[in-house]
């Protein structure tokens, strides 16, 4: 038995190792291509450093920012605002979306006002919000909440509405309560839409955060970029953009994506073949 199981186990282990390698290398390929083009452009086209800084200058700036402590200070400040605004947006959007999704008449009544406010970009609120909230964390949190809320709200409402009613009727026919129907049918069915809304909302939350910090904040990655622009330090500007992108990718691939996969699998919303991968 062990002689037969060993080759199978070895094959399975090799496949998992290959999948992990592919999971890392394939998404990295476009970044490598951009890096190569960037290096070739600065080497052969030789634009001014203010127009396109060399890769070495950007890396040197990141090192200097890290050693001086500025990088950690700005990253922590931005992450604090992002997480606070996103958590508020996710919670309120999820609760509101589920409630509206469960009541089609309520959904029809609220749809016009949701479309109205969703069409107004968070940036448009800046002049008024600066008057109300001042410049600082409260302003950034509001803009992030305003961005994340509508994305999660609409995805949650849509996910709930698309759950087939026959599933709900089946649970109720077996004597299930309203809460049991919600827990075993509605939430699992809407879960893929909700999680997609969360991931998308966080991505747009970064944009709202940087916009708020550009307007005015003592610390933060947006503030760092804006200050660098005043001194024509394009190397720090590019460094700030790279840092934002790297943090966003890390959050998505090592936090949000694993949570999404585990949660969806827990509710049995993937095929058995996918579970084995």
Predicted regions and their residues:
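Short hydrophobic, aromatic-rich alpha-helical segments embedded in or entering the lipid bilayer
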Residues: 53-63, 67, 206, 216-229
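Transmembrane alpha-helices
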Residues: 142, 146, 178-212, 235, ...
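Transmembrane-helix boundary motif in ABC transporter permease subunits
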Residues: 84-114
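Generic hydrophobic transmembrane alpha-helix motif, especially the helices
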Residues: 115-151, 158-162
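Periplasmic/extracellular loop-to-transmembrane helix junction in inner-membrane transport proteins
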Residues: 13-20, 44-88
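Hydrophobic alpha-helical transmembrane segments of polytopic membrane proteins
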Residues: 221-259
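Short cytoplasmic-facing helical segments at TM-TM junctions of multi-pass membrane proteins
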Residues: 112, 155-197, 221
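Transmembrane alpha-helical segments of polytopic membrane transport and secretion proteins
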Residues: 1-32, 253-277
